Every structure is written in structure tokens, then in C-alpha cells.
């Protein structure tokens, strides 16, 4: 099992923008030094607590500061961007990273982002599908382009000059394009079936109960079979909120205490998702009353925290429910205490993973 990381990120809105950007960059640089396989970075335009507004710009700032870690958008929210712009920008960063880029995509889940871009009342899933189809066509078809759609028409026919290169979008470094990765939230996700049919690979969200995470595998398997791909657990990434400490007292205080980053994270996530009518994501049973979905319940059921041996045991128990998967994605959280947060990443990479892979 490989180790990767993902961060939305999610920080207290009171913290300075410059400070949290530096902290998030330091987290990826540390992950690279510790041998993490990948780092996925989220993006949100209209959220002060989730302040990275462009995952591609953020990742570009890390190209010369990292050596081996693959850097992924987590995700580019396609309805909020013009497909031609994303095709060109992704091709550029893929060439700059020379094969270390992963193209994470989604329809976007932040409603205020959809609102500011004028997409609140549109079918954003339909926009997402049209956008990625346009992007793949731009990369694979010769110029001049003449792509028609419901939301975007893309052409360079009027101003195409082959001799000078005008009207031609650059293509990615990886052939035929960077690996496409999708985040999966909904239990028994039909969207995952469609993604797997196209050869895309999933990351299951870190704020889902284990039984809902487990529901993703049969959907991925079904999609792979329908698309003619091998359904291999090694291609399934599962995100999890984990805190590893040198002693149990510190683990519990930082991992579940009111002053810790995990408490802040899940308080924010619960408010957003429950406010958007999605309390079921936090329930282990859909018949569970909404009133039982408390913050303490969510922390106890979704955060893995403890000493090395305890965390290993908890991850094994988690896998007993989900089944095997290829990559454990360590969810990044605010560094309330930088030393404890860094130590957790070190223990995760140097002690927890070797024991899990024995």
C-alpha cells in the first residue's frame, strides 16, 4: 500500500493568507522528503477557510522545491473554467513537471463558487462532462478546432496559421494525457461507474463512514468492466484523517480535542455538508436520526488517532470494512501545532506504513 496526501486545505479564516499558503507548501515539501507518493491540492475561489484559489498555480510553485512526489490538482472544478484555458494550463504544468502531474477533476461542490461563476442553477455535472470531453478533444485532435457543445463552442478556424503555430493549443507531456483522477463522495456513486468506464481512477473522501467508502469498490469494479479495464484495488485511493503521536494522551487531545485541527475541520465540514442537505454522509446507517450526527460522534467514527501501533491497528480495522485499496491518502489539516503535525507525518511515513506493509 502506497502513501499519498490530500489537502483541501481548511484553515481558520482568521489566519493570514500568506501564512497558510506557506504552511501548505511546507506540508507538501515535507511529504516529498518523507517519500509520499503523491500530493493532491484542492481549490476554492470563494471560501476564506479554504483559501487556495488555483491548485495549478500552487503546484507550479512547488516544482523546483520537490524531487519525486507526484503533484495533483484536487480538483480543478471544470464548470468554473473555460475548457480551452484548462487544456492549455494543464498541458503546460504537465510539461513543467515532466510526468509528475496528476489531473484531478470534479464538477465542484462549493455552492458559492457555482454562484459567482453563474452556474448555480445549471447542471454542473453535465457541464463537467462536456468540459472534459472538450479538453481531451483539444489534446487529441489536430487544429484548427471546431468543437460544439451546450455550454462551450471552441474554435480557432478563423485565425489558424499553421506555419506560425497560431491557433494551436500545446499538448501534455504524458501520452496521451496525465492520469485523470476523480474524487468520490456519494455512497454507491453512479458517477464513479461512469469515470471508471473511461479509465479514470478514484479517491474516496475522508469524511465518509467506512461502510460508504466500501460501497465505492463495486461501483468502480462495475465501471472498469463496462469500459474494458482491469479493476485493480491498487488503482483505488482512499483518504483518511489520521494523527499519529508519540503518546496516547497527545494523540487524543490533538486528534479529537476542541483546540485541535481535526475538531475544527469536521466542525466546518459538517456545517457545510449538513447545511447543503447531506447529513447522510456522516451516518453509518441511513435510518440514523439527524440529531445523532454530533461532532463527537463524527470525530470518534472518522478520525484515526493514536500511537504508531494503535494507528496501525485502526487502519487495519478500517480496511476490514472497506476491503483492500492501493493508496492511503493522508488528509492534511491545519497545523495548529506545527511540531505535532510534522511529527505525525514523519511517524506515518517512517513507522506506520512499514508496519502496514509487512
PLM regions and their residue ranges:
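N-terminal beta1-alpha1-beta2 module of alpha/beta enzyme domains
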Residues: 1-71, 177-178
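Hydrophobic faces of well-ordered beta-strands that scaffold small-molecule active sites
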Residues: 3-5, 39-41, 71-74, 101-105, ...
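Active-site mouth loops of central-metabolism enzymes
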Residues: 7-22, 76-84, 177-187, 243, ...
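Glycine-rich, proline-tolerant flexible connector loops at the mouths of alpha/beta enzymes
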Residues: 38-62, 77, 109, 207-210, ...
Amino acid at each position: 500500500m502506497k502513501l499519498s496526501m490530500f489537502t483541501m486545505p481548511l484553515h481558520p479564516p482568521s489566519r493570514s493568507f500568506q501564512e497558510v499558503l506557506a504552511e501548505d507548501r511546507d506540508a507538501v515539501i515535507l511529504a516529498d522528503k518523507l517519500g509520499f507518493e503523491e500530493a493532491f491540492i484542492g481549490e476554492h475561489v470563494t471560501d476564506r477557510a479554504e483559501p487556495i484559489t488555483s491548485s495549478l498555480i500552487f503546484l507550479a510553485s512547488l516544482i523546483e522545491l520537490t524531487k519525486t512526489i507526484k503533484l495533483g490538482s484536487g480538483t480543478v472544478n471544470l464548470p468554473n473554467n473555460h475548457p480551452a484555458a484548462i487544456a492549455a494550463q494543464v498541458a503546460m504544468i504537465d510539461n513543467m513537471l515532466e510526468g509528475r502531474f496528476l489531473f484531478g477533476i470534479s464538477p465542484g461542490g462549493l455552492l458559492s463558487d457555482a454562484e459567482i461563476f453563474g452556474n448555480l442553477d445549471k447542471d454542473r455535472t453535465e457541464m463537467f462532462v462536456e468540459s472534459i470531453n472538450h479538453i481531451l478533444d483539444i489534446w487529441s485532435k489536430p487544429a484548427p478546432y471546431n468543437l460544439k457543445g451546450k455550454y462551450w463552442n471552441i474554435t480557432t478556424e478563423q485565425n489558424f496559421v499553421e506555419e506560425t503555430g497560431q491557433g494551436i493549443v500545446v499538448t501534455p507531456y504524458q501520452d496521451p494525457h496525465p492520469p485523470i483522477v476523480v474524487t468520490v463522495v456519494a455512497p454507491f456513486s453512479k458517477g464513479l461507474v461512469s469515470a471508471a468506464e473511461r479509465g479514470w481512477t478514484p479517491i474516496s473522501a475522508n469524511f465518509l463512514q467506512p461502510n460508504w467508502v466500501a460501497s465505492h469498490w463495486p461501483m468502480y469494479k462495475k465501471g472498469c468492466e463496462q469500459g474494458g479495464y482491469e479493476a485493480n484495488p491498487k488503482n483505488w485511493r482512499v483518504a483518511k484523517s489520521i494523527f499519529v503521536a508519540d503518546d496516547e494522551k497527545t494523540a487524543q487531545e490533538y486528534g479529537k480535542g476542541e483546540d485541535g485541527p481535526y475538531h475544527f475541520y469536521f466542525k466546518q465540514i459538517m456545517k457545510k455538508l449538513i447545511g447543503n442537505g447531506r447529513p447522510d454522509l456522516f451516518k453509518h446507517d441511513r435510518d440514523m436520526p439527524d440529531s445523532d450526527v454530533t461532532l463527537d460522534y463524527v470525530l470518534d467514527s472518522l478520525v484515526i488517532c493514536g500511537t504508531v501501533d494503535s494507528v496501525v491497528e485502526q487502519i487495519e480495522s478500517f480496511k476490514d470494512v472497506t476491503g483492500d485499496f492501493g493508496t492511503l491518502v493522508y488528509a492534511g489539516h491545519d497545523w495548529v501545532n506545527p511540531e505535532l503535525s510534522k511529527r505525525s507525518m514523519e511517524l506515518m511515513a517512517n513507522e506506520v506504513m512499514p508496519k502496514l506493509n509487512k
